[in-house]
Swiss-Prot record:
Tissues and organs where the protein is expressed, per its UniProt entry: Expressed by the venom duct.
Protein's UniProt name: Alpha-conotoxin-like Qc1.4b
Region (Lacks the Ser-Xaa-Pro motif that is crucial for potent interaction with nAChR): 24-26
Disulfide-linked positions: 22-28, 23-36
Cysteine amide: residues carrying this PTM: 36
Propeptide feature: residues: 1-19, 37-40
Length: 40
């Protein structure tokens, strides 16, 4: 596989970890609407 796919996968897993840790926390979720879906 090429390096770009590896980097993208690493970034995606970081984002999922951040989402899992952040989005249940209202103040973090509000500050990160792009990862937590916002717009409610």
């Amino acid at each position: 596989s090429d390096g770009r796919n590896t980097a993208a996968n690493d970034k995606a897993s970081d984002l999922m970890a951040l989402r899992d840790g952040c989005c249940p926390n209202p103040s973090c979720s509000v500050n990160n609407p792009d990862i937590c879906g916002g717009g409610r």
